[in-house]
Amino acid sequence: MSEELELESEFLPEEKSETIVPATVLTQSAGIERGKFRSLTLINWNGFFARTFDLDELVTTLSGGNGAGKSTTMAGFVTALIPDLTLLHFRNTTEAGASGGSRDKGLHGKLRPGVCYAVLDAVNSRQQRILAGVRLQQVAGRDKKVDIKTFSIQGLEISQNPTAVLTETVSQRQARVLSLTELKDRIEEQGAQFKQYHSVADYHAMMFELGMIPRRLRSSSDRSKFYKLIEASLYGGISSAITKSLRDYLLPENLGVRKAFQDMESALRENRMTLEAIKMTQSDRDLFKHLITETTNYVASDYMRNANERQGNIETALSFRKEWYAAKSEQDLSQHRLIDLSREAAELTENEKALEIDHQSASDHLNLVLNALRHQERIERYQEDVNELTEKLEEQKIVVENANEQLEESQLQFETLETEVDQIRGQLADYQQALDAQQTRALQYQQAIQALEKAKALCGLADLSVKNAEVYHEEFEAQVETLTDRVLQLEQKMSISEAAKTQFDKAYQLVCKIAGEIPRSAAWDSAKELLREYPTQKLQAQQTPQLRAKLHELEQRYQQQQSAVKILKDFNQRAGLSLETADELEDYHAEQEALIENLTAEFSEQVETRSTLRQKLEQLTALFEEKARSAPAWITAKSALERLTEQSGEQFEDNQDVMNFMQAQLEKEREFTMQRDQLEHKRQQLDEQISRLSQPDGSEDARLNVLAERFGGVLLSELYDDVAIEDAPYFSALYGPARHAIVVRDLNAVKEQLAHLDDCPDDLYLIEGDPAAFDDSVHSAQELAQGVVVQVSERELRYSKFPEIPLFGRAAREKYLTELEAERDKIVEQYAQRAFDVQKCQRLHQQFSQFVGLHLALAFQPDPEQQMREINQQRNEINRELTALSTDEQQLRIKLDNAKEQMQLLNKLIPQLNVIADESLSDKVEECREQLDIAEQDEIFIRQHGMTLSQLEPIANTLQSDPENYERLKDDLYQAIDMQKQAQQKAFALADVIHRQAHFSYEDTVKTETNDLNEKLRVRLEQVQAKREQQRDQVRQKQQQFAQYNQVYIQLQSSFETKNQMLKELMDEVGELGLTVDENSEQRARVRKDELHHQLSTSRQRRSFVEKQLTLIESEAENLTRRIRKAERDYKQQRELVVAAKVSWCVVLRLSRNSDVEKRLTRREFAYLSADELRSMSDKALGSLRTAVADNEYLRDALRISEDSRKPENKVRFFIAVYQHLRERIRQDIIKTDDPIDAIEQMEIELSRLTDELTGREQKLAISSESVANIMRKTIQREQNRIRMLNQGLQNISFGQVKSVRLVVNIRDTHAMLLDALSGNQEEYQDLFNDNRMTFSEAIAKLYQRLNPHIDMGQRTAQTIGEELLDYRNYLDLQVEVYRGADGWLQAESGALSTGEAIGTGMSILLMVVQSWEEESRRIRGKDIIPCRLLFLDEAARLDGKSISTLFELCERLDMQLLIAAPENISPEKGTTYKLVRKISGNQEHVHVVGLRGFGAKE
């Protein structure tokens, strides 16, 4: 993300030419200069778009008011220095006093959106310019996360400004921030090196190597310490986090001593484990030999047994196949003899099956005829009932229709009377509801008018009035009577026409059912045609069974004729002839008899030849068996010779070659023995030299340590233990023979003890001096090109050359130790090789001696297996000749069988020549089939329509005339009835008007008239109600009568449908039977059945006779068939066995070859043992193996799986598992061989040598408690001296009332007791260190618990506690004290000091930590690198001017840079000050910065 913002002003115009960092920094001085930070660059920070702060060599001050950006600038520096988000937390801008803080660790709010940079520019001691920084970017989301990526740039010129590198100028007042990818491209274009780091550890490793940070930060713990130091410096005061763990900051971890202890413990542990393994291997040697021997016998015997069985199975399968093929050949020859009788038997069987089918068909036909006759009787009976019911049903239908008409008329009259009663009741109600006469009269008048209007509308009379209403009423009454008479006439005519129409419709429906839909006019012609053909079709249907039987007989005879023709054709085709007459067939019969006699004689000659060859084969077999008996011993001798050839790499042609090689092997063994002894002596010398140089304090004689402790002094080598490897030759030559001297404080006090020394080196040097502040000014020395001249005394000079291999100082000793250890490892490897060569020669000579005694007489004899192969070739030739004879014999048999087969065909053809001669048989069959087709069609027609034709025949004459006027009469009747109803309605409306004539007149006496009118209406109502009740009774009677008639009709209809349904079912069943019966049908069916039964009995008698003859002839063929089947079954079973064994054998071979064990399993001598002997050998070995592997779960499971005889590959897997187990158990790192047997033999001697060697090494590596105590005391004393040196640099520091600062280091009482117990002679503690089951760490932990039983050790193990006790830092207590006013020395705590004093004291402690880190890392840093020193101080206003001057003086004295922040009232005289002012112009906010050089600075 790039942004374009307005560039900020850098410096004031008059100050642009001023350089903050002097140019002298970049010049190469005579000595090594300390690295310095040149500048800090902030890009796109809050208030700083592109700002570079040049840092002063001493103090850089950020001055400004609150919010000016001082803390932001320091935060940018800290972020670039420690870019670890898990540590960064700027508390002064987040939550004051909070321990956790917000999710924004004070960094997110200091950045602006987009790409941001914080870059440090430094120049190290090598005058290399390094730009190290971070790219920061806000991550979207409410968590306020920041993404950080670290990078570095090297190779830029000094003149290039970091701001110009990180931004791109867009215009005069605008610039764009480059992304990380764009920055990389730009740097590479300029020829510099850009590197991005994927972890903070890599970033800090680069900064350490280039001298930007004081120590290597390997882990997050180291980064946390560094950050806490920077944080304590930034916020000022005494940091409790540092003072509480001051040991971790000031005291370096003595990794060398600790690692030496761990290495010694590991070596001891490994030696003890190796010794136990050696003892176990020696005790298991006999078991291993027994295991490998029994495993080989167990697997190899089964392996060779399977190989022998596979070969035997193959040979057996080949013999079975040979026997099978021979039997099949015999079967092919014998089958020709059985063809005739087999064919005849087959034909008789087929004929019998056909007769059985015909007989069964005849029986079924007889049953069908009987069933059809019974159905026919029932059909006739049901047909009569149906006809009778049809007549009754038609009569009853007429009665029901008449009753229905009467009921409808009565209902119509009843409805008319009901309407009239309702009207009269309405009038009465209207009259009764009238309140006065006028209302009644008005109401009556309105109703009369409504009735008159209704009559006008209904009658269509516009001039209708009260006066002429009666005239019209009479006229309509006359019309109603006329229409009633017409309806009665039409009903009478309708009843007469309906009877004629019913018969016509019935006959027409029957014709349509048979002939399909036809016009009514063509119904009579179609009926005549059907009735005319009906008798002929009926007769043809009756003849169908006879025609079918006749056709069956003709077809059977025709099939016999075709079969005979086919046999004759096959015979001519096989024989290649065209015989047709009986004479020709008889002549050919005689020729075949002569041919059979000749073939029989030739067959006898071949039998004699085969017997001679078999005798010769038996002789060769006896010779083969003799060679096979002598082969195993020769194979064993040859295998032994081959093994010796492989091991020696020589080829032996005869016995003398073997003896010469044995003599040469003895000479070679003596030579190797001498070389081995020389290497052993040289290795012992190197071990002694390494042991002397491995002493932690540099003393080569352990007695010097005792003397130094006795005199209260320190070894000179211990004081110079940290000397650099470059200075080691100088100091080694400077002190010469006195390099192993003891430095004591008072020589006079020591002189008194010299006389009482018992055990001391021959030359003991003592030097007087302070061990805590010793220097090399003891002698007056002058360094020359190749050595050092030392003025020992006025009259004595000593010149010592620089040693080629200096041993003064730990670094020099470690370097030389590395070389000696490499040389010793090389000597050990050579010694092991020579020892192995000696053992190899001894073992090879022993094996040759054994070979000479057992196998030398047989090894060089001719190969018996080669002779056996030659014998096998001869046997195979004889077998081939026997196979050829067998083939010829089979061909003779085939010819003989063919001749016999032709004889059988001739015997069968001669009796059937008469049938073949009948040529008219096919025409008869076709003619009979056509007649049967016609009869079957008529039979189907009669079956479908016979009943319909019988019903049509009596009523067919009704079709001659069609009653077409029936429909017209029916329409006239309905029309007349409608007119009658309309006339009745009109007459009723006029009658209503007439009844209301009085309502049209007006009378004066209304009441009288009303009463009279009411009386008339009541009278009329009573009359009409009486008529209605009478009419209701009449309707009820009509309904009952109609219901009775209808019930009878329904019963008749139901009975008719039932009878008719049963009739249809019977007719369908008869139709399904597919035949038409008559009086003679039963007799014909019985005669046909009896005839077929007679024919079937005759055929069965003939077939029984033929089968008896066939059984006699087939007895030999059946025996041969059983023989073939047995041979085939045996062959297939054997072949399956071979195939299955092949699959398993392939798995075994592949497994053995891939595992390189095939050669070990192929024991050729086992091939001559029987299967029982091999199985017995395998079973014996299995019993022994079960006992041998009983304690090994893996081998026990593998052995159990291998016992499955169906899977021989499991035995090979077991063999491989045993060899793999042996390879794992033996010491493959000592003896290199692929053969476990050879390795076991080699290990026996090699392990006995290692036993002595490891026992001696364990004695050398044994750690004594006294030596541990001495090492601890020396290390503690050295660190105490170093702390005293640090205190010298803090003596003149003063802040306020604090006049001095110092570090106090003491040994803890509990650990002092432990040191005394380790170095003392208490016998009660030695049991812990003499226990081989405990390591030294565990022993020292147990001792610590004994001495301090009151201390709770928690859940920690003894090993963990012991490892902590081997760290000298846990023995010390380290505190900071200050000398303050009248109080004297006090412990440095923030509560006892003022703010300024606490800040100054804390800064002093941090300086000590930094200086200690630099010294600690001096050995692992480049010799030409002195790291940068820079600390921070925020809110420096809390210090007074004197304290600030003290800080400046401290920075100048310690060559340290300081970055402080202060309000505007702080203006130090030295260093560089930046005035920061935050300004807002428009919508943009930026910090205006002005850089000022201190006015007290020296040019």
From Swiss-Prot:
One of its GO terms (biological process) is chromosome segregation. Keywords: ATP-binding, Cell cycle, Cell division, Chromosome partition, Coiled coil, Cytoplasm, DNA condensation, DNA-binding, Nucleotide-binding. Transmembrane segments: none annotated. Gene3D superfamilies: 1.20.58.850, 3.40.1140.10, MukB, hinge domain. GO terms for molecular function: ATP binding; DNA binding. It is found in: Cytoplasm, Nucleoid. Residues 696-813 are annotated as: Flexible hinge. GO terms for cellular component: cytoplasm; nucleoid. InterPro entries: MukB, MukB/SMC, MukB_hinge, MukB_hinge_sf, MukB_N_dom, P-loop_NTPase. ATP binds at G64, G65, N66, G67, A68, G69, K70, S71. Belongs to the SMC family. MukB subfamily. The hinge domain, which separates the large intramolecular coiled coil regions, allows the homodimerization, forming a V-shaped homodimer. Plays a central role in chromosome condensation, segregation and cell cycle progression. Functions as a homodimer, which is essential for chromosome partition. Involved in negative DNA supercoiling in vivo, and by this means organize and compact chromosomes. May achieve or facilitate chromosome segregation by condensation DNA from both sides of a centrally located replisome during cell division. This is Chromosome partition protein MukB. It comes from Mannheimia succiniciproducens (strain KCTC 0769BP / MBEL55E). The lineage of its organism: Bacteria, Pseudomonadati, Pseudomonadota, Gammaproteobacteria, Pasteurellales. The gene is mukB.
